[in-house]
Regions:
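ATP-dependent carboxylate activation and anion-phosphoryl transfer catalytic cores
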Residues: 229-313
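Short acidic/polar capping segments at secondary-structure boundaries
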Residues: 16, 91-93, 119-124, 140-144, ...
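Protein kinase-like catalytic core scaffold
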Residues: 135, 190, 197-198, 258, ...
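Rossmann-like NAD(P)H-binding beta-loop-alpha module
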Residues: 109-136
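ATP-grasp fold ATP-binding core
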Residues: 105-106, 128-148, 170-183, 200, ...
Length: 313
């Protein structure tokens, strides 16, 4: 007979028609949570029938339509989140949801891909000229590379895409295209409870001129061991994130999950993104990584139980 589960965990997701085949982690994560005597449930964040109070932990997994309705998502998060039960913490998610967090990490000494945030078409054109000859245009709030393109700096599409983004009520981010991404891709280092779990190499996604390599959004993922300088920058970025969490949000507990995306340049590695909200972990490329994640969730449940017992005493 099975013992009582350590706890019930909601893996926060969205509808299948949004996810498609892009969610590659959740099956293995669910299996390892069950193996750790945890009861997982996939829960769509905008499903009004879900009883969020029935869960011990709410773990953000893949609510990938949030960027189309960010205000609605944040209002939902604020309504259901209870202290210690929503992971990663809502304050961190709110900060990380907008990619302008990169500028704060830069100010803390983390080398980032040069980034300009634009609020008008004129600012976009000036930033494109400065960042060229080849640039990446994206919204500051986005998921799955939506409304993101690699373009020549003088391509008329730069302005038309920027106007669409601005019309959606978002700011525009302009970055130079990093040549090594087209050949070597990016390095993504995944941390669970602040400890490096594994790293993968992500192949190029964007095609010059707009659109995706191969005509559709796909990620070519392979296991990798980063060079020392890349690994050191990932750790530096994590240290800066911990500093932000402590100073701004009084959060001193390690984040349950984080993914640090890095690129290599002639001037050394640079931070491209720090994914603290809804990243893929690519557990299929790293045997044992889903089990490590499940162990971290089990520790959170145990800590939550201790806090509850102390409160009730």
């Amino acid at each position: 007979m099975n013992s009582k589960p350590l706890g019930r965990v909601a893996l926060i997701t969205t509808s299948d028609d949004v996810l498609g085949y892009d969610e590659v982690d959740i099956d293995e994560i669910e299996a390892e949570l069950r193996a750790a005597n945890i009861a997982p449930t996939r829960a769509v964040w905008h499903d009004p029938s879900v009883d969020w109070d029935a869960f011990d932990l709410l773990v953000v997994r893949c609510p990938w339509d949030y960027s189309e309705r960010p205000r609605e998502f944040l209002a939902w998060m604020d309504a259901v989140a209870a202290p210690g039960r929503f992971l990663n913490p809502p304050d961190v998610i709110r900060w990380n949801l907008d990619k302008t967090y990169l500028l704060e990490l830069r100010d803390l000494g983390v080398p980032i891909v040069p980034t300009r945030v634009c609020h008008t078409p004129a600012e976009v054109l000036a930033a494109a000229r400065a960042a060229g000859p080849t640039i990446v245009v994206k919204p500051t709030v986005s998921a799955g590379s939506k409304d993101t393109a690699m373009l020549d700096g003088d391509d008329p599409v730069v302005l038309s895409l920027a106007e669409k983004i601005l019309g959606d009520g978002k700011a525009v981010m302009i970055q130079p295209a990093i040549p090594s991404v087209a050949t070597a891709g990016e390095t993504a280092s995944i941390y669970f409870d602040g400890v490096l779990s594994h790293s993968v190499r992500k192949g190029p996604i964007l095609e010059l001129g707009g659109g995706f390599v191969g005509g559709a959004y796909t990620e070519a993922i392979s296991a990798t061991t980063p060079p020392p300088a890349v690994a050191a920058l990932a750790d530096q970025a994590m240290a800066a994130i911990r500093a932000v969490c402590a100073a701004r949000f009084a959060i001193r507990e390690p984040l349950l999950y984080a993914r640090i995306d890095l690129v290599e340049t002639p001037a050394g590695p640079k931070l491209l993104e720090a994914e603290l909200f809804e990243p893929s972990y690519f557990v299929g490329q790293a045997p044992g990584s889903a089990a490590r994640f499940a162990s971290c969730v089990a520790r959170r449940l145990a800590t939550l139980g201790e806090r509850t017992s102390s409160t009730n005493f």
